[in-house]
Amino acid sequence: MARAIMFQGTGSDVGKSVLVAGLCRVARNRGLNVRPFKPQNMSNNAAVSDDGGEIGRAQWLQALACGVPSSVHMNPVLLKPQTDMGSQVIVQGQVRGEARGRYYQELKPQLMAAVMESFARVSEGADLVLVEGAGSPAEINLRAGDIANMGFATQADVPVVLVGDIDRGGVIASLVGTHTILSEQDRAMVRGFLINKFRGDISLFDDGLAAITRFTGWRSFGVVPWLKAVSRLPAEDSVVLERAVRGDKKSLVVAVPMLPRIANFDDLDPLKAEPDVEVVMVPPGSSIPGDAGLVVLPGTKSTIADMQAVRDNGWDRQLSAHVKRGGHVLGICGGFQMLGHHISDPAGIEGHVRDIDGLGLLDIETVMEPEKVVRNVQATALLHNVPLEGYEIHIGRTTGPDMGWPFARIGEHDDGAISPDGRIMGTYLHGVFNADEFRRRFLQNLGVQSSSVNYRAGVEAALDELAEGLEACLDIDALFNLK
């Protein structure tokens, strides 16, 4: 039976996903057969696993760190928020339905069987399984029926390490407070803690570590400094987008409106890695920069609602002005659907609003349909006749005259559309900029000099650098031998 360790946080965005990815690479480098697992994830940043279902992109990255194919069983329950009150529920890669907050709390006990089945599948043939929790175990109002944190840990008898984020302040209180609020049974599952995102001289926190141990009885497994490699890895939580600030002037400014239900925003990461490209996230209430050469409308979990948000923020008028100035626009997935004249949802799949006018930048229309397309694809970008690898996760069928100038060819059918002047493009494919040759040709078309950036190699190098950093600051031997 594989050994397992679960990393739970004192709150969201403490860095659990990246820590688990780095520790997966540490274990792999030590010759262990290691696998990632997250019982429940909430994210619109989904990936298509190697076995053809939807999982969180964090688990996809963790599988890459392990050097193994990704599987739906690595993230058996995925919640994709569609509104402020409800989410689409994905179980073992497939859509189970939709659930509002209270109904989902009632549904969770039924999902534990799927979680435990997937955990058993992931554990087969593994030496070590590194498990990631969700949110915080101190949310005791959600403890009944919990499958994400202590509910899973106690059911599967997996020891827990708590992760505290010192960068946001109050890490001593958050760890000691978690100890105080946990039940005696849950507290017994915790073997210790580690501190993440420390800046400066770590020895200055020695007294802090001693205080946490004095109040809780938990041992410290180490303090992780702010590691630069983390910034070169795909992020899962959209909260990182809110921190983006403009940097030095680059050859090309790419503006990205921050849609309320933005999805798969790691599509932008390869552009951020380009030395002559500045990616500017445009938050609600802000204007699209006038110096942008390209505007990317990203994916979204709720196209109609986010199309209304585009209009409410005045981005529709700003996009029209951008195009009149000679600017380029790329729409990805839901962003592609917004580029057309009209979006209709006769079955109410996305909500009570059944139709909305689009931006009218492409001569296309979209009808939402119940069947969801989820697949990895190999394609050819027709504008440059270069290969692409990407993935589709969408509902809706798009038709119209501009589909006669497709963005890509996938097997026997075409994808996307390009305007007659070539400045407006749309595609259902996520991950297109991961393809180095396509990205270079695309940027050259926008006047940016070709670079030698190999994006996938850069991610692998960042994982290796992260693993090296964790080896230096954590007691890995003690962690990997927890019982």
Curated annotation (Swiss-Prot):
Record's keyword terms, sorted: Cobalamin biosynthesis, Glutamine amidotransferase
Q: Name one GO biological process term.
A: cobalamin biosynthetic process
Q: Which SUPFAM superfamilies match?
A: Class I glutamine amidotransferase-like (SSF52317), P-loop containing nucleoside triphosphate hydrolases (SSF52540)
**Keyword Transcription appears in the UniProt entry:** no
Q: Which family does it belong to?
A: Belongs to the CobB/CobQ family. CobQ subfamily.
Q: What does this protein do?
A: Catalyzes amidations at positions B, D, E, and G on adenosylcobyrinic A,C-diamide. NH(2) groups are provided by glutamine, and one molecule of ATP is hydrogenolyzed for each amidation.
* HAMAP family given in the database record: CobQ
* UniProt protein name: Cobyric acid synthase
Instruction: Give the source species.
Output: Brucella anthropi (strain ATCC 49188 / DSM 6882 / CCUG 24695 / JCM 21032 / LMG 3331 / NBRC 15819 / NCTC 12168 / Alc 37)
Encoding gene per record: cobQ
